[in-house]
């Protein structure tokens, strides 16, 4: 995109992150004692490793699927692993997930997420104010239903404006890295849709600097959510504070055309904070990060797989063309096509493609913190858990299970289509799975912005496939960078370039 700075998918590698974590352990002399824990009666099998603090982290981050499958064969579906200073009990049987997600009193997501927000975004009040927590989560309802329809209408207008002012003017082949292109595109559309327009005379410079600072912050994010003391993360803390200053209550109020959810968040935060409290900006940073951090890499992977699979691109373009013809819409110079949420949902091939992309690249985990010593009943077995430990469900094992998905490593755009409709029936061990793709979490931790994110991906893919010629340049296969393990959509482990130009329309 014009005006976009170079953005690579070069997130900190797992070994670099673990190296810094290991250095931090030198400051904590008692950490070695943590590895001396022994298994008590009725507790799950315990896998500690020999490295102080790190435990089994090196093997886990190198190849998490193989690591967990190996332990599953050795110890069964439930076991505890010592990882980076934490004891995490994995429950790998998908038919037992409900026993973890439906016990919020003893297995809490809220306290875990509040601590994460305190360190990653400097939102401290959520740790102690349950009323604020409830009000913040209640506001997320404005990302569903009719408010979501209004957001989609705004998004369409923002896409139209951005494409017509910049991208449609590119009539000769232009080469960019896919991740950089997707990052700039998703950032600008998302920010304008949610926060409105910056009215200052130097608005292009302001949004460009905010975008670049956000990308730097996001690259640092795995460090921020680690156990490394914030005092050792001076660059990360400095970037965090810089963005917070750009999103103060006063500066957000000066933006024109804010979405209803941003207005609601502004109003409710004023009830809990002074008008000039910097923590209001910290809340906005957390909300902005949640709106972008997984959509950008998901959009990258969607473009990457579609460009590498001509049959997918052809099927998607055929579906879009058929829809436009059925609704009397015509393609031509300028953005003239329009979609409602119901119409986007009706595009079965597009829905299947996005689900397949999320299945392949999502490594999110459902995490709960044990609030008290307890017994976790899993059908015929019961395990003792200790206060302060964590319980994790790991959906990538389902996503990559050959019993559930034939050839799970392959990209198949039509995997979720059956007889021209969405396929929703998948089995394991002869039993139907209630949920078979879980990129957005489960239960109380399910991403509230999932519909917004998927609709944005659908809309952008439609516009790119309709109005542009697209070709991949780097045809080498790439893999996943696992430095964001547990955090959602993984980044690629290397850069990939493509070229594009606006289609020429004959009158």
From Swiss-Prot:
Q: Mind listing the GO biological process terms from this record?
A: B cell chemotaxis; bile acid biosynthetic process; cholesterol metabolic process; digestion; epithelial cell proliferation; estrogen receptor signaling pathway; negative regulation of intracellular estrogen receptor signaling pathway; positive regulation of epithelial cell proliferation
Q: Which domain of life is it from?
A: Eukaryota
Membrane topology annotation: Multi-pass membrane protein
Q: Could you confirm whether the keyword Lipid biosynthesis appears in this record?
A: yes
Q: Which residues cross the membrane?
A: 14-34, 178-198, 287-307
What this protein is called in its record is: Cytochrome P450 7B1
Question: Phenotype when inactivated?
Answer: Knockout mice exhibit impaired generation of plasma cells and overall deficient antigen-specific humoral immune response.
**InterPro entries, from UniProt?**
CYP450_sterol_14alpha_dmase (IPR050529), Cyt_P450 (IPR001128), Cyt_P450_CYP7A1-type (IPR024204), Cyt_P450_E_grp-IV (IPR002403), Cyt_P450_sf (IPR036396)
What is the organism lineage in this UniProt record?
Eukaryota, Metazoa, Chordata, Craniata, Vertebrata
Q: Which cofactor does it need?
A: heme
**What GO terms are given for molecular function?**
24S-hydroxycholesterol 7-alpha-hydroxylase activity; 25-hydroxycholesterol 7-alpha-hydroxylase activity; heme binding; iron ion binding
**What pathway is this protein a component of?**
Lipid metabolism; bile acid biosynthesis; Steroid hormone biosynthesis
Identify the enzyme class: oxidoreductase
Q: What does this protein do?
A: A cytochrome P450 monooxygenase involved in the metabolism of endogenous oxysterols and steroid hormones, including neurosteroids. Mechanistically, uses molecular oxygen inserting one oxygen atom into a substrate, and reducing the second into a water molecule, with two electrons provided by NADPH via cytochrome P450 reductase (CPR; NADPH-ferrihemoprotein reductase). Catalyzes the hydroxylation of carbon hydrogen bonds of steroids with a preference for 7-alpha position. Usually metabolizes steroids carrying a hydroxy group at position 3, functioning as a 3-hydroxy steroid 7-alpha hydroxylase.
Family note: Belongs to the cytochrome P450 family.
């Amino acid at each position: 995109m014009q005006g976009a700075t170079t953005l690579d998918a070069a997130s900190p590698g797992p070994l670099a992150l673990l190296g810094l974590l290991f250095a931090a352990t030198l400051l904590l002399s008692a950490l070695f004692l943590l590895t001396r824990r022994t298994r008590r009666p009725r507790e799950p099998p315990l896998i500690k490793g020999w490295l102080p603090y790190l435990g089994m982290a090196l093997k886990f981050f190198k190849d998490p699927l193989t690591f967990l499958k190996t332990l599953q064969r050795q110890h069964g579906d439930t076991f505890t692993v010592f990882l980076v200073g934490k004891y995490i009990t994995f429950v790998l049987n998908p038919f037992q997930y409900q026993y973890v997600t439906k016990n919020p009193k003893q297995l809490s997501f809220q306290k875990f997420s509040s601590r994460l927000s305190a360190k990653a975004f400097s939102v401290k009040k959520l740790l102690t104010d349950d009323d604020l927590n409830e009000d913040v989560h209640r506001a997320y309802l404005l990302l569903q239903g009719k408010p979501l329809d209004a957001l989609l209408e705004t998004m369409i207008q923002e896409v139209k404006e951005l494409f017509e002012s910049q991208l449609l003017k590119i009539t000769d082949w232009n080469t960019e890295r896919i991740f950089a292109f997707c990052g700039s595109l998703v950032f600008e559309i998302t920010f304008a849709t949610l926060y409105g327009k910056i009215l200052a005379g130097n608005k292009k410079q302001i949004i460009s600097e905010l975008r670049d600072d956000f990308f730097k912050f996001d690259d640092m994010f795995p460090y921020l959510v680690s156990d490394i003391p914030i005092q050792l993360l001076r660059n990360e803390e400095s970037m965090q504070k810089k963005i917070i200053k750009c999103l103060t209550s006063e500066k957000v109020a000066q933006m024109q055309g804010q979405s209803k959810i941003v207005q609601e968040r502004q109003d409710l935060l004023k009830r809990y904070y002074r008008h000039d409290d910097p923590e209001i900006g910290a809340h906005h940073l957390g909300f902005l990060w949640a709106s972008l951090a997984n959509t950008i890499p998901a959009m990258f992977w969607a473009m990457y797989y579609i460009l590498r699979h001509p049959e997918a691109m052809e099927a998607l373009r055929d579906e879009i063309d058929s829809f436009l013809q059925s609704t009397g819409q015509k393609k031509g110079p300028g953005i003239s096509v329009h979609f409602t949420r119901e119409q986007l949902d009706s595009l079965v091939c597009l829905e299947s493609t996005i689900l397949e992309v999320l299945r392949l690249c999502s490594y999110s985990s459902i995490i709960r913190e044990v609030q008290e010593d307890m017994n976790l009943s899993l059908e015929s077995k019961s395990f003792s858990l200790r206060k302060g430990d964590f319980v994790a469900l790991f959906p990538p094992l389902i996503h990559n299970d050959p019993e559930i998905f034939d050839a799970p490593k392959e990209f198949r755009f039509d995997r979720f289509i059956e007889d021209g409709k969405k396929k929703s029936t998948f089995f394991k061990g002869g039993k139907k799975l209630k949920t078979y793709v879980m990129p957005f979490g489960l239960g109380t931790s399910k991403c509230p912005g999932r519909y917004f994110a998927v609709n944005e991906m659908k809309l952008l893919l439609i516009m790119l496939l309709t109005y542009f010629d697209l070709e991949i340049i780097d045809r080498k296969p790439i893999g996943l960078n696992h430095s964001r393990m547990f955090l959602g959509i993984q980044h690629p482990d290397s850069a990939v370039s493509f070229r594009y130009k606006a289609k020429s329309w004959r009158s």
